[in-house]
Amino acid sequence: MKCRPATSADIPEMTRIITEGFLDYPFHIMLKPYLYQPERYPQCLKAVNRMLVRAYLRCRNALVVEHEGRVVAVALMHDRKVGFWDNFINGGHELFRYATPMLVLQFDEVAARSDQVAIDLGDFDWYLEVLSVDRHMRGKGVGRWLVAKVLPDFVAKRGGRAYGFVTSTESNARFYTNGGCELLDLVEVRLREQTCPIWAFQRRAELLDS
């Protein structure tokens, strides 16, 4: 098993892994009732994730884990937030097939407020936007290896102090706590009439033993 920088050839598998991993994610499910056609929520989520993968591949840091020649996990990291236009030109415009511009803007604002919880309370200079493991590899230590070993080393080698992130599921929160991450806060966010919890975390940078 190895972690490497993603390439454009990885985009389809990265998009699939993230979409499958986040299909039932409470934060994203808040979108569903307000889409033009709620039954097209999976396609909308795929468009969101394809946009993120393309934007991070082009502008920031996109990593994949390979096992036996297959991509089995994805991590998207940044030390400077990806801007609106970077997202737009990398597929953000596709979201308007599924949602009004107002809904897209509101969802983006809620995401920014969620991230800001970690930013305000943490002491980190890198941010983990997405972490997702292929469903066939869950429970085999891939996520823990990334969170506790690979990503702290990645940040440390770039002179960083720590990385921050948020999650909206209790099971993820337990996973991160057990993986040595520091819980910063638990809050609730709202998109129109929908709400979900947000756990904010940070993890200190640490070089792997050579």
Positions of predicted regions on the chain:
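A short beta-loop-alpha structural element at the N-terminal edge
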Residues: 2-29
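Conserved active-site alpha-helix within GNAT-family acetyltransferase domains
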Residues: 144, 169-186
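Conserved beta-hairpin
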Residues: 59-75
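Conserved GNAT acetyl-CoA-binding A-motif
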Residues: 124-126, 154-168
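Conserved acetyl-CoA-binding loop-helix of GNAT-fold acetyltransferases
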Residues: 133, 139-153
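Conserved beta-strand-loop-alpha-helix junction that forms the acyl-donor binding cleft
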Residues: 129-138, 164-174, 191-194
